[in-house]
Amino acid sequence: MLNMQSCEKWTPYVLGLLRIIVGFLFLQHGSAKLLGTPHIAMFDGLQLMSLMGLAGILELVGGTLILVGLFTRPVAFILSGQMAVAYFMAHAPGGFLPILNQGELAVLYSFVFLYFAFAGAGKLSLDSIFCKKSN
């Protein structure tokens, strides 16, 4: 049986691990759009100043900042909004349920980023290092 006290001491580290994984996965979306790696044919010829291009900038820069845990709360808040907008612009017109309109990932990212906006970066982050030095 799990001892809740022993689980609680690991919570900041698990939060940090979740943040690192989500940041890495998210920055890949921006990398595919802007850098062409990994190559996804639908992003060939993407204009930087289009909505998809601007989303790519947010995904690449924001995903990197989330990955390293720098400015986590404000960046996560912005990315949560970006994913909510992406859902309502690109997926919601295809139907009410995310499983039917292929919007599950946008919804999931939106709420995970919203969680990070409130919970912070956790351990293993630049935010935690800078906060220790300023206290």
Question: PLM features: what roles do these ranges have?
Answer:
Residues 1-35, 52-57, 61, 68-135:
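Extended, low-polarity transmembrane helix blocks
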Residues 34-52:
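Membrane-interface interhelical connector segments
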